[in-house]
A protein has these predicted regions:
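First exposed extracellular module after export/assembly in secreted or surface-exposed proteins
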Residues: 1-114
């Protein structure tokens, strides 16, 4: 999991995914079509995103999303492993965090599934 802390409060957490797997890209596009506001290709907002909660609930997983102004959040990257387990390739997660004062930081995580 990825721990996020913002002393000034969290305004936005966007998660963008890319992959060398065409099947993964296709799966992400399918998710975007079925869950409004869950477009990981363009970047999905996590803060307050109840559709993301519904998506992971439909996958049998629990996900809590932060509210705007929260100062901490643990992004459960492991929840995505269900999607990745059968899709070989290099999968990249880019997290962009913006605080309430407009300060922005990016983080990158690459997972390789063989």
């Amino acid at each position: 999991d990825t721990y996020i802390a913002a002393e000034n409060g969290i305004k936005s957490i966007k998660v963008k995914m890319s992959s060398t797997s065409e099947d993964m890209i296709s799966s992400l596009n399918d998710l975007a079509g079925n869950y409004d506001g869950v477009d990981f290709i363009s970047g999905a907002e996590v803060v307050g995103n109840q559709e993301m909660v519904r998506l992971f609930g439909d996958l049998g997983q629990t996900l809590a999303v932060p509210a705007e102004g929260d100062t901490e959040y643990t992004f459960p990257i492991g929840n995505f492993f269900t999607l990745l387990a059968f899709l070989p390739g290099e999968h990249t997660f880019t997290l962009t965090i913006t605080d309430m004062q407009g300060n922005t930081k990016d983080g990158l995580l690459k997972l390789t599934v063989e």
